[in-house]
Structure formats: C-alpha cells, structure tokens
Amino acid sequence: MNETLRNSVKTMLRETFEGPLVPGKGSWFTNSESNSGIFGVLEGMSYDQASMSVHGTTLAAHTDHIRYHMWGTNEILKKGKQPEMDWGKSWDIHSVDAQQWNRIQEGLRNEYFTLLESIDAIEWNELLANEVLSSLAHSAYHLGAIRQMLKVVKV
C-alpha cells in the first residue's frame, strides 16, 4: 500500500476512534466537536448505562463486538489467516459491572492501538488491505449505532 493511502487509512481510523484531528475545525465524517469518536462517545458512560438494553442489545455488547472484530483483524494481520470466530458470542454481553466495563473499553483501546501500529509494519496485499478497510467501515458503522443508542440511554 502506498504511503499516501496508508496515512489516509490511519487518519480515518483515528477519527473513528479519537474524533477529528482538530476539534471544531471540521472532520472527514464524524461531528467536528471533540469526543465525537468512539472513545469520546463512551467516555464518562457508566456501567449502568452500558448495560441498558436498547432493542435487545447493550452499549457494552456493541463496544465489545467492535473489539472482537478488531482482534480478528489484528490476528489476520499477524498470521495471514482468519482466526476461528464466534460472531453470535460476540453479542452475549447483557450487563456489566464497573470492572468489566473498564476492561471492555481497555481491550478496545489495546486492539485499536495494535491495529494502528500494524498498519505501518505489515507487508500489504489485497487480503490485508480489505481486512483493514473492513475494520474501519465496521467500526464507523458501530460508532453510528452507539450514537443512536445514546439517545435512549442518556434520556
């Protein structure tokens, strides 16, 4: 992957998770204010809020599902093949306590930073490029879903 495209992918991933590079000065696709990425949206959310069911799923489940998908991406980048994954199980979280909620968020942060580092280190091919781009699209989709769920949770 050429350097320009690699840098663009990293920019989009950062915006998805960390929000716009310069809050208030525009963005590529999130809201332009700070904390509009996944980490900012989740910041300050209590474990009770993360456990509230919205149409049969929770913010904790969405957050861990993003982590799980990104873990799979990181495994593919490391080993060159898809790990065995149980997608149904990735939605099994119905309630969390404070410690579990912190662990889920920390796990997501770790997978995110692992992916960012890997983007500069891997030997690119079509499979790996598609996997990284799918992780970006998947995470952006769930950012939107989480933002919609928050309208119910924070009422």
Model-derived features: positions:
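Short, contiguous alpha-helical
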Residues: 2-35, 39-42, 47-89, 124-155
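Acidic/histidine-rich alpha-helical segments that form the ligand environment
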Residues: 91-133, 139-140
